[in-house]
Amino acid sequence: NPDGRDRYVNWFNQVKATPYSIDQNAKEHVEPWPSGRPNHYLFDLNRDWAWATQVESSQRIAIYNKWLPHIHVDFHEQGINNPYYFAPAAEPFHEVISDWQRNFQTQIGKNHAKYFDKEGWLYFTRESFDLLYPSYGDTYPTYMGAIGMTYEQAGHGRAGLGIQTNEGEVLTLKDRAIHHMTTGLSTVEISSKNAVLLNSEFKKFFDNSNLKYKSYVLKNENQDKLNRLKKLLDKHEIRYQSAKEGRAKGYLYSIQDQGKMDLTSSDIIIHTDQPKGKMVKVLFEPKAKLADSLTYDITAWSLPYAHGFDAIASKTKLPSSNVAKDSTIKNSIARSAYAYISKWNSIEDATFLGALLQENIVPRFSEKAFSIEGKSFERGALIILRNDNRNAEFDAKLIAIANKYQRSLTTVATGFSDSGVDFGSYSVKPINQQKIAVISG
C-alpha cells in the first residue's frame, strides 16, 4: 500500500546498507512511524474509495469512473512471511456480486496457479480478504460491475532490497516484482480469452430491476449536511433528484421498521433505476446481508446512518424532479455593525472558523442560546465583534471568507440581547489562534 511512497523511499535511502542486509533486525527493515503506509495526512487510502475523504481518493475515483474497467486489480504487499495471495476472495461476498463475478475470479486464480506451480512459488487463495466492505480497491470496482481483486505479495515496508524470511528463504525486490508481473500478465491473458463474456456479463450487471428497494429518501434537516452528501454522490456519478411533496411508505431508518415519512421538495431521492444502482444499494441499504459473520473489516456503513439522516427506503419508485440549483449566499459589508453573527450547525461552520483564525480574525462563541434584534441563535453561535478586530480590512476579509464558505452572516447594531446572554457575558468567550503540538519519539 504505497500511499506514502516518497516517505518510505527517502527513509530507505538514508539507512540502507551497501550491499543490502538480509537480517530482519537491520535498520533498513525496521521502518519508523509513520511509515510509508498512509498518505500525508496519515490516512489509509485503501479504505477510502467509497468515502473519498482524501484528495487522492477523489482524483482516483474520477479516473476510475471515466474508464469503468471490466477488470481491476489492486496490487498490494503483505507481511514478509506470507508468500502471495490472489483470487478467488474469501467469504463473505456481498449479495450484489453476480455468480459470473464469483466464478471468473476462480478461473483467474487457476490461471495464476498454473504459472506459480511451474516455478514452485507458494501462494494462497480464499483466505482473509473478502468482498464486503465497499471502500476497498477490489470491492468498489466489483460493485461497479468489474472483476475486482486484491493481489498481495510478501514484502510490505520491511523487505527493502532483500530480506530473510522466518523460513530461511531470501526474498528480494526482484522476486516481488516478478511475482506481481506474472499475475498481472496472467490476468490480461485470461481476460483476453474471455473478452466476449466479460463484455456481456458486464452489461448484465447494470440491470437493476430486481433490487428490493427502488428509492431512498433523505430528509433535509440540515442543508450543509445534505450538500456534503450530494458532493459525495457527485464524485461517484450517482444521480439524485428532489422529492415531490407527499407521503412515502417503506423502511424507516429511525425506527428500523416499516413506517411513513412526509416528503417536501427540499428532500432528495436516490433511485436504484440508474447505472450505479447496485452501488446505491450497497451504500444506502439499512443492513448489509452477511453470509458469514467472520469478515476482514466493518459490517455497517449505511450512508443515512453514517451522516445522521432521517431516511426511508421504498420498494416502489417514488415521484421526483430535477434538483434545483443551490442558491448562492452573498453577504455585504456593514461598517456600522456592532457585530456579525454566524450560526453553528455543521462541519462547514468549523471550516469557516478555521479560515477566520488563519486570517487573524478574532471570533467569540456563545456557550448559551440568545435572541437579539428579533432573531434567535443556539449555543455555539460565532460572534465576531468589531471591537475585537480593529483593522481597516476587517469587514472586507470577513465578508470574503463568509462568501467563499457560503456562511450566512447576521449583523446587529448592539450587544444587548432580547433574551439570553449579552455579548459581554462570561458565557461569550473569545477563540484564540490554536497551536497544536504533535509529540513523537
Model segments located where?
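Detector for the c-type heme attachment site
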Residues: E77
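Active-site rim/loop-helix segments in enzyme catalytic domains that contact anionic ligands
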Residues: N1-L42, N46, Q54, S58
